[in-house]
Structure formats: structure tokens, C-alpha cells
Amino acid sequence: MSEKAVAPSRYATRVAAQAGNPRVDRFSVLLVAVAATLWASDAYFRNQLIGHLSPTQIVVAEDALVTLFLLPVLVRSWRDLSHLGPRGWVAVALIAAGAQALATILFTASFSYGIYAETFVLQQTQPLIAIGLAWIVLGERRRPWFWPTAAVAVAAVYMVVFAQDPLAPISALQKGRLEAGLLALGAAALWASGTVLGRFALGSISFWSMTSLRFTLALPVLVVIALMQYGPAGFTHYRFTDFVPNLLAIAIVPGLLALLLYYRALSRTPASLATIAEMAFPVTATLIASAPPPWGFNQPLYATQIIGTGLLLGVIVLFNWSKEKAPPVVQATAA
């Protein structure tokens, strides 16, 4: 076997052709992590709604608000959308129906079994799935040092999430129910595919168009799911105080702003690196739970959580630096 530099693919050429801000591009891996941190900010606002609204009803309202905000963008980007092609449209449709709509519902449903440790430990399969899909779909190849470094990131997240009882996942997997595990695994697979397919679609369209399509195409899917679950009566439970400020805040911060930042950064970040940076989400969610009410649940903060957070941040910074400094990736070919 010998290693030869591979000529840029059509996909890579399209990505390179897109204009970007050099400062943003330089810190793209870090910005993916910032976007993932913003996703976790919805915990405070969502807690004010779960008393009388289901997860599906909350997601439908959030998606409808963001779609309303982005409709002018979608109208102005019709020329941009013509660059997608059949495979691009399939990718965007799968993101909207899978990563945006179905994955959130599956992940939330997995908690209904009361086996939280099993849900979180299976969620850690998301980076592995995304890295595998990036290898298959995008042809991404990582150098040998990437794998132990990624393992450190996974271990760091484990330290944060299971600081109180490191053996909790073992007990949960022994006593857990298959249904809860399958739901969590399904959500992880859909979110992982969303990262890879999003990176693929961004080779043809702008991050504004990608964000607009994700929410707009997901809305009818979510409406159908809500109708199947609750019927027309499911849309009568909303109150004005739900929208201002809670649903509006969810739509703007972890919804609109976070996804715009995420896709802008993802357009300059390999999917296999982005999926590691996305692990800032469970870490942030766990740390928010340590905040005093009403922001969090006043859970104790452990030294291992601080260490784990530092390790994950170090890995993300290293990946961001290596993305800029490393020479072009090569692929192994037959001698």
C-alpha cells in the first residue's frame, strides 16, 4: 500500500469555491461547539412549558416560528436552491424529517422509560456513527492520532454526565429495556446523519438556505406527527404566555441563531471533527443543571465534571488547530 494525494472531488471543489470570512473559517470547529452550547440553552425555557405542552407540541411551535422568520430568506434564495440537484434534495429532506423532526421525538420518548443513564450512554454512539458516515458519504479520512484524541473527548463527556455514579450506565444496560435503548440509538443515528448530510448539502447551497430548508421542510412532518398523536385538539393547548417569552426564546436562540451559526461553521469543518465539537451539547446541558433555580436544578457540581469539561475543550481546540495546520488528507491506494 502507498499513499497518494487524491485530486479534489467535485464535492470538495464546490465547498472550496464558496466564499467565506477567513476569521470565521479559522475557528469553525470552535464555532460548532458554540452552536452546540446554544442548543442546551433551551432547557430553561422548555421547563416552563412541559407542564401543559408535550415535546411534539413544543417542537411544532418552535419550528413554525423559525420558519416564519426565514421565509423571506427562502424566497430570495431560489437561485441558490437550483444548485442542489437530486441527491442534495434527498439529503436536505432526510435532515428535515430525520434530524430535525423525528430524532427529537425519539430522544424525548426514550426518557419516558425512566432509564436516563441508558439513554445518555447510547447517545455517545452519535460521534462513531457520524465518523463512519463521513467516511462513506464524504470520503473523509482521519489520521491515526485522531482516534485516541476522539476517545479522550468521549471519555470527557462521560466524566461530566456520569460524575455522580460512573457505574450507572452498566447497571442501566443490565436492567434496562430494549425499547428505550432503540429509541436513543435511533435518535443518535438520525442526528449523526444530519451532520454528514448537512456537510454534503453545504457543498451546493449557502448556510442561510440550508437553515431555511431544514425548518421549512420539517414543519409539515411535525404537523402530521402532532395530528397523529393528538388530533386537531393538540393545537388548542397553546397560550399567549407560552409564546412570549418561552417559545419565542427557544425559536430565536437554540433554534435560529444556533443553527445559522452551526451551518456557517459546518461549511468549513469536516463532519468527523464537527461531530466531536457537537459533544459540547450534553456537557453544557449537564452543567446548566448545576445552576441554581430557575436557570437549573441546583445539582451538585463535581471536580470530575470540571476536569471533563476542560478535556473536551482541549480536544476541540486541538482539532480546530489541526484543521488549519495539517497538510491535505491523503487516502490509501493500492501500490
Q: Which residues does each predicted region cover?
A:
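Transmembrane alpha-helices of multi-pass small-molecule transport proteins
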Residues: 2-13, 27, 52-102, 129-133, ...
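Glycine-/small-residue-enriched transmembrane alpha-helix faces in small-molecule transporters
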Residues: 2-60, 168-200, 224, 288, ...
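Membrane-interface helix-cap regions at the ends of transmembrane helices
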Residues: 18, 44, 48, 52, ...
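C-terminal transmembrane-helix exit sites in multi-pass transporters
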Residues: 69-77, 126-151, 283-307
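C-terminal-most transmembrane helix of multi-pass membrane proteins
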Residues: 2-18, 145, 243, 279-335
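Hydrophobic/aromatic residues within transmembrane alpha-helices
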Residues: 49, 58, 62, 110, ...
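Helix-helix packing/entry segments at the starts of transmembrane helices
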Residues: 35-36, 58-61, 100, 117-125, ...
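Specific transmembrane alpha-helical segments of multi-pass solute transporters/efflux pumps
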Residues: 38-45, 77-117, 122-123, 159, ...
